[in-house]
Amino acid sequence: YKRQGQMRNTGVELEVRSNNIKTKDFSWTTAFNLSHNKNKILKLADLPWFVDGRYVRKEGYPFNTIYLREYAGVDPETGSALYYDNQQDENGNYTKNKVTDPGQASPIPLKDITPTISGGFMNTFNYKFIDLSFNLSYSFGGYSYDNASYILQDDGYSVISNKSTEQRRRWQKPGDITDVPRFVYGNKKGGNYNSSRAIHSTDHIRLKSLILGLNAPKAWLQKLGIGNARIYFSGTNLLTWAAYDQYDPEMSGVVGFYTPPLKTYAFGLELKF
């Protein structure tokens, strides 16, 4: 093994628990946690930077920085995909000329996939014989690259496979304002070349779990010789609010054809003698 360089990781985690209300018949408790992590490549052994798949490992940048062409949208008159050329001048600044040929557009460091913050928020309620708890998970500031976009968003290059629903927003006539190029059979100038068009925010809030339970009155159970009886409903991954909903937002980095987490529902009966 060879030491490749130096990297600094920093972060903070916060957890807060509270008993919000507690009376004879009602109680409400809350648990909240938050984490913030970041890293930076300080030094590389042999080169100041190198490309590793969809990432660039570069001094001064986060380890998981996506490195691609920068998508510039669609020409409203022709429907052609546009890219920023991103040529560096003598001061190291990138030019922002729009070109239709992706070969004239240089890849640049774009987004760090690591979320800025992530965590969970759990609440538990008890009222007489009823209990309810739910857990929300959240993540903000992260990104992912849709590696399947070269098939699902190929703008007509191949008609063998299915296409993304985003193709409904494609350019169709001069004057259309959209970020999806025209759909042309055999299109070799579409927007499916490796670019920031396939980079998406992973910001989301998810109802990770929910449990609703009903406890039978003790007076009923004593006659039956039962210590406790409870029926409940539970569910996981019930709702998700996401900035981009074409694939599971909990997936980060380079995302392909993956099965999303399933919604699950369960009913149960607990008996204690």
Pin down the residues of each PLM region.
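C-terminal beta-signal and terminal closure region of outer-membrane beta-barrel proteins
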Residues: 2-9, 53-80, 163, 170-175, ...
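Conserved small-residue
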Residues: 3-8, 12, 19-113, 153
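Hydrophobic, lipid-facing positions within transmembrane beta-strands of outer-membrane proteins
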Residues: 10-16, 117-123, 130, 207-212, ...
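Transmembrane beta-strands of outer-membrane beta-barrel pores
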Residues: 18-20, 34-40, 127-129, 138-142, ...
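Repeated loop/turn-to-beta-strand initiation elements of outer-membrane beta-barrel proteins
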Residues: 24, 129-134, 219-220
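Outer-membrane beta-barrel and related beta-rich outer-membrane complex signature
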Residues: 28, 39-55, 141-170, 241-248
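Membrane-embedded beta-strand positions of outer-membrane beta-barrel proteins
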Residues: 30-32, 134, 231-233, 269
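Extracytoplasmic gating/loop element in the C-terminal half of outer-membrane beta-barrel translocons
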Residues: 139-230, 235
